[in-house]
């Protein structure tokens, strides 16, 4: 496992009393993010609809790092609820609130309660590319075959 990096986190007023993102097991890759909606106003996500769910958190990533917001497998498997823009990218220079864009692919409305774990956040290094314009690319066995060209 790589050594931990320091990431500053700011809790906004509507996240008071909620736990900070946390790893749920010794070797978990993602920190669970919780919904920071009002306790007396659960959110209802209708089938086929999407919604931006607040977390009440802002982070300051070190340069050359990103955070990815990904689905929680249990929500997807049990309820058909997933992150619409998975993975959502949080750049190192973004300082706004982390929002989770959820979509309900299930058949029933899904209720999002305050403090419910709704997504996971993976922090990873970023490699920046230097693009070089060329007239031709090197040949490969695959060539230009895409979408399904290597099998079903």
UniProtKB/Swiss-Prot annotation:
Substrate binds at residues 72-74, 85, 89-91. Keywords: Hydrolase, Magnesium, Metal-binding, Nucleotide metabolism. Pathway: Pyrimidine metabolism; dUMP biosynthesis; dUMP from dCTP (dUTP route): step 2/2. SUPFAM superfamilies: dUTPase-like. Its cofactor is Mg(2+). It catalyses: dUTP + H2O = dUMP + diphosphate + H(+). One of its GO terms (molecular function) is dUTP diphosphatase activity. Signal peptide: none annotated. InterPro entries: dUTPase, dUTPase-like, dUTPase-like_sf, dUTPase_trimeric. This enzyme is involved in nucleotide metabolism: it produces dUMP, the immediate precursor of thymidine nucleotides and it decreases the intracellular concentration of dUTP so that uracil cannot be incorporated into DNA. Belongs to the dUTPase family. This is Deoxyuridine 5'-triphosphate nucleotidohydrolase. It comes from Rhodopseudomonas palustris (strain HaA2).
